[in-house]
Swiss-Prot record:
Its cofactor is heme. The keyword Heme applies. It comes from Medicago truncatula. Keywords: Heme, Iron, Membrane, Metal-binding, Monooxygenase, NADP, Oxidoreductase, Transmembrane, Transmembrane helix. PANTHER family: CYTOCHROME P450 82C3-RELATED, ISOFLAVONE 2'-HYDROXYLASE-LIKE. It is found in: Membrane. This is Cytochrome P450 81E8.
Amino acid sequence: MTTFYLSLIISLFFLIITLKVFFNTSRKFKNLPPGPQCLPIIGNLHQLKQPLHHTFHTLSQKYGQIFSLWFGSRLVVVVSSLTIAQECFTKNDIVLANRPHFLTGKYIGYNNTTVAQSPYGDHWRNLRRILSIEILSSHRLNSFLEIRRDEIMRLIQKLAQKSYNGFTEVELRPMFSEMTFNTIMRMVSGKRYYGNDCDVSDVEEARLFRGIIKEVVSLGGANNVGDFLGFLRWFDFDGLEKRLKKISKRTDAFLQGLIDEHRFGKRNSNTMIDHLLTQQQSQPEYYTDQIIKGLMVVMLLAGTDTSSVTIEWAMSNLLNHPEIMKKAKNELDTHIGHDRQVDEHDISKLPYLQSIVYETLRLHAAAPLLVPHLSSEDFSLGGYNIPQNTILMVNAWVIHRDPNLWSDPTCFKPERFEKEGEVNKLLSFGLGRRACPGENLSQRTEGLTLGLLIQCFEWKRIGEEKIDMVEAKGITAGKKTSLNAMCKVRHPLKINDVF
């Protein structure tokens, strides 16, 4: 009972502080962007419905291309204009170079010290340099080319074995997910953890890893009101913080085990872990085990689900638009022919295939609200005053459907990217110094996968009804229903070498 009253007193104390901060901030800044009326304490949290980018779209239609909300005591500004977004990350790029801190960043992101969550400064610059040079540089990506090619060809082989004798129904989502996770994990550690042919000899190790990833992804997409109403964290009603603490310990132990395995020479040397451990020997202060584990977490969470989601959306659109599929197939037949499979170095010579990827990213950005930013000082934006410690979100989903920027904005039309400069209007990977550094890897994987799927197979929908394009609710904007389709090997194409 004593503990209960103590918790109650502490909660009331934080409640009073929250109210004081809320009303003081509201009075201090009179030229904030417009927004809906908010309630004491909770602000506008009661108005937030999933998917958030749809809710923000509705609000932007009423309040304009820049509007404000209160998530509890935290001010949030939402931008739905390309011009204002560009102003954010050119003129105000340094001011908006920080990230807000959430519980997931504390427990999964090593207390907000990874390159994704770290505050802007020397530590972040060092992490970005490591990521850009040691992991995602063109040289390093080229050294991992065989891994990407092998994992994609394993996917093609599975589909070919199923459909060599005629059209066969296949479920594509688990295949895409398996391919992207195995690709990243082989780059990181040299191991495959997914599929019946995974090469992890310890079955328990593979099961443990898959369980960790599933829970991390689930908790990473959870809505946590305690991030905005701090006094609720004392109660942890839904047990989220307790689960985050538990999974963070399991994740850390697993990643540390991988590092130790490579440190003592039990794996091959062409992996991300090995390259970073080599640097650790000469620069131990920059390449600590925690930094390496943080980079591993970022690669796994940012480089896997997003690519598989994009490929699934692309195939869904192609199945709904067979004339676009046919045009892409003709491009491949003309430039590549029937005697070999398309390869990664061919993608730059296949503009229509690239346009399909761009159009998919336009309509179905995996992160439709990008990653939130945090202002480090007061600044002006779009004629309004934005105070320090404001969370800024960019609704790329709305910008990518702006009729002032795109003709027939809701239609899937890859041809629009034949016009020079159109690709510069895409925000799928963010803008400014904190834009996603994995764009090159992502587009290599997506381009080659789609190219081979189109080149090697005939595709059609299961029935006359079009593919359902409803979005799921989650941290990445994937399809609500898994993609099933009919596929058949293109017999004129010589693909016997994939068996």
